[in-house]
C-alpha cells in the first residue's frame, strides 16, 4: 500500500494524486507509481530498477494489460504489485501446486499470476466480496486462456471455508493458499487453512509489514485504516512466529509477505 513507515503516517489524498501524476513540476511519473509504490525499499530508483530489469520484461502481456487497467481504478492501491505477482508465479511452479485458493481477489492480478503458473488441469478457488472488481479483470484472464481454472465465489470467505472444513475429503487437499483480504480475519482464516492445506503445502499472507507501520510506536500519527488494522497485523505476526504447526518466512516483497509451510 504505502512505501515506508513515514508514508504510512504522512501520505494524504493530494500527495497520492501528485504521486500518480508526477511531482507537480512537470516531471513524468515512473511506471510503478501508477498504482503506488508497493515496495518497502527506501530507494524509489532501486525499486524501479528491479521492475525494469527483472519484472516488466518478463511480465506476460495479459498481466501487463490487467495491471494497466487496474491502475485506472480508484482503489488501485489494493492490487498486488508486479514483483509480488512474479514471485507468486514462480512459487506456484516451484512447489508444483495444482489445487490452490485465493482469499481476496480485487481485479485478479495475483489470481492471474497463479492461474498462469498452474498446469492445464489446475484449479483456484477464489473468494471476494466484490464481483464487480473481479469482472473488471476477467476479460484479461479469459484472454490468457486460464478462466476455466478459476471457481469464483462472491461473498465472505469464512462460510466457504467452514463448509470445506466440514467436508473431511477437503482436508489437506490444497497445495497453496494466498490471503490478501480483511486483516481482522487473518487468524480465523489461518486456523481453517491449516486443515485444508496439505502438510508441506504453503499459505501466503499479504501485507504483513502493513506499510511499515509495524515498527511505529503506538502513539505515532497514522492514517485511519492503517491504525485500524495495524494491531491485527501485529497479532498475526506474533501468532505465526509462535505457531509450531508451520515453518515461516517473512519477506519484504510488496507490502510484506509471510509464507507458512504446514508441518503438522
From Swiss-Prot:
Enzyme Commission numbers on file: 2.1.1.104
- Function of this protein? Methylates caffeoyl-CoA to feruloyl-CoA and 5-hydroxyferuloyl-CoA to sinapoyl-CoA. Plays a role in the synthesis of feruloylated polysaccharides. Involved in the reinforcement of the plant cell wall. Also involved in the responding to wounding or pathogen challenge by the increased formation of cell wall-bound ferulic acid polymers.
Protein keywords:
Lignin biosynthesis, Metal-binding, Methyltransferase, S-adenosyl-L-methionine, Transferase
Detail which positions bind substrate.
Answer: 38, 180, 211
Pathway, per UniProt?
Answer: Aromatic compound metabolism; phenylpropanoid biosynthesis
Q: Which family does it belong to?
A: Belongs to the class I-like SAM-binding methyltransferase superfamily. Cation-dependent O-methyltransferase family. CCoAMT subfamily.
Compositionally skewed regions (Low complexity) per UniProt: 1-20
The alphabetized list of GO BP terms reads: lignin biosynthetic process; methylation
Q: How is the cofactor bound?
A: Binds 1 divalent metal cation per subunit.
Protein name stated in the entry:
Caffeoyl-CoA O-methyltransferase 2
Task: Write out the catalysed reaction.
Answer: (E)-caffeoyl-CoA + S-adenosyl-L-methionine = (E)-feruloyl-CoA + S-adenosyl-L-homocysteine + H(+)
Please name the source species.
Answer: Zea mays (Maize)
Residue ranges of the region described as Disordered: 1-37
Cofactor dependency = a divalent metal cation
**Can you tell which superkingdom this protein's organism belongs to?**
Eukaryota
Annotated GO molecular function terms are:
caffeoyl-CoA O-methyltransferase activity; metal ion binding; S-adenosylmethionine-dependent methyltransferase activity
Q: Which residues are S-adenosyl-L-methionine-binding?
A: 80, 102, 104-105, 110, 128, 157, 182
Biased composition annotated in UniProt, kind: Basic and acidic residues: 28-37
**PANTHER family attached to this UniProt entry:** CAFFEOYL-COA O-METHYLTRANSFERASE 1, O-METHYLTRANSFERASE-RELATED
Amino acid at each position: 500500500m504505502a512505501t515506508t513507515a513515514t508514508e504510512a503516517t504522512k501520505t494524504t489524498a493530494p500527495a497520492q494524486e501528485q504521486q500518480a501524476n508526477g511531482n507537480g513540476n512537470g516531471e513524468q511519473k515512473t511506471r510503478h507509481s501508477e498504482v503506488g509504490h508497493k515496495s518497502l525499499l527506501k530507494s524509489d530508483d532501486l525499486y524501479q530498477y528491479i521492475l525494469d530489469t527483472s519484472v516488466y520484461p518478463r511480465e506476460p502481456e495479459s498481466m501487463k494489460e490487467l495491471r494497466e487497467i487496474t491502475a485506472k481504478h480508484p482503489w488501485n492501491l489494493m492490487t498486488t504489485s508486479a514483483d509480488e505477482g512474479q514471485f507468486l508465479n514462480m512459487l506456484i511452479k516451484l512447489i508444483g501446486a495444482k489445487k490452490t485458493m485465493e482469499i481476496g481477489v480485487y481485479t485478479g492480478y495475483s489470481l492471474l499470476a497463479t492461474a498462469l503458473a498452474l498446469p492445464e488441469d489446475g484449479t483456484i478457488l477464489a473468494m471476494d466480496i466484490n464481483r464487480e472488481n473481479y469482472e473488471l479483470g476477467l476479460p484479461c484472464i479469459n484472454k490468457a486462456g486460464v478462466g476455466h481454472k478459476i471457481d469464483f465465489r462472491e461473498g465472505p470467505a469464512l462460510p466457504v471455508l467452514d463448509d470445506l472444513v466440514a467436508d473431511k475429503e477437503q482436508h489437506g487437499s490444497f497445495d497453496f493458499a494466498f490471503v490478501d483480504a480483511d486483516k481482522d480475519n487473518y487468524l480465523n482464516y489461518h486456523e481453517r487453512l491449516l486443515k485444508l492445506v496439505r502438510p508441506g503445502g504453503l499459505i501466503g499472507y499479504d501485507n504483513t509489514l502493513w506499510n511499515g507501520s509495524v515498527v511505529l510506536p503506538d502513539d505515532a500519527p497514522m492514517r485511519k485504516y492503517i491504525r485500524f488494522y495495524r494491531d491485527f497485523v501485529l497479532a498475526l505476526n506474533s501468532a505465526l512466529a509462535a505457531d509450531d504447526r508451520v515453518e515461516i518466512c517473512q519477506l519484504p516483497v510488496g507490502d510484506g509477505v509471510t509464507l507458512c509451510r504446514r508441518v503438522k
